[in-house]
Amino acid sequence: MLHDVDYVLRKLDWLRAEGIWPNGLRYLWTDAFGVVLYVSLYTETGEERWLGAADRLVADVERVLGRRRGLRIGEAADRDGQYFHYLAMWLFALARLGDLKPKYRKRGIALARDIHPAFVIPGRGVIWKMQEDLSGPYPGYGLGSMDAYDGYVSYRMLGEDALAVEIAQMRDLMERDWRTLDIEQDLGLGMMLWLAHFFPDEPWAEAQKRRSLRTLETMWVDPPGYFSRAPWLGDTKFAFTNYGVSLGLQAAGIWPGRVDRLNAFFEDWRSGDEYDREAITWVMACTSHLPGAFLTRGGEGSTERDEPRERSSAGPVVDGSASRRKGRG
């Protein structure tokens, strides 16, 4: 596991000076990674300023993206709707910050209870993208392929007892799915490795780790040192998705040389498009160099009990013919 705090501090100074992050547009996925990064920096340095930065970031995300239920995908006009896997990553961030400040764990539990009935169809799946008010699926979007795994892990990080019903529903969806699930894109493979490392002895995690590593092996391109977008797209590469693979590999404790190779390659490589200056690229680069609080510390899963719940009404039912989405990023 890398601990390159100096790299992260230099990159954060540059991001702020350029008005990219955290003083740019809000984007839920990036900001979730950012909250965990701040927790990692606090853990590494012991400096209270990083907890203050996390407090301010959470407050700004809730102010800008928060809705009556859930959080919008991003601040930009074309980032409407709500993604479940973005929300799940935000829940994970609240759990990690909640390890240090319990109010955030309570906030995460409340958010999970609020959004779960809208996205989850028990026994069927998790809707990948919903309309912004959670009134129904976003047009053209069906069931996600990894979303139950996202929710399962984040819910367990927040509270095993407080979210027992929701965890059981996610576990049931996974049990129906893990034997046949084949992930084919780089970021999804990296994130599955990351998800699996929290509960490595569970059958789904053992199987998906093996399968993900086998697929990633076919996607490694060296020279120069990167993972392609998919096995059949050897020339297609994205920096931020490779950084997600790096997180997964460090979670799995495998291929450290490849982690170093891809970090070195993407530090200098430029795509020539907007991603060269997108916050998602460089916040995830920081995570690749300092995974820290993203990784298990043993004894994961909170048993904290919360106040009696107020259940939301059940969400909409999606036509069973809706496609299952495998892509990420």
Which residues does each PLM region occupy?
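Glycan-recognition and catalytic cores of secretory/periplasmic carbohydrate-active enzymes
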Residues: M1-G329
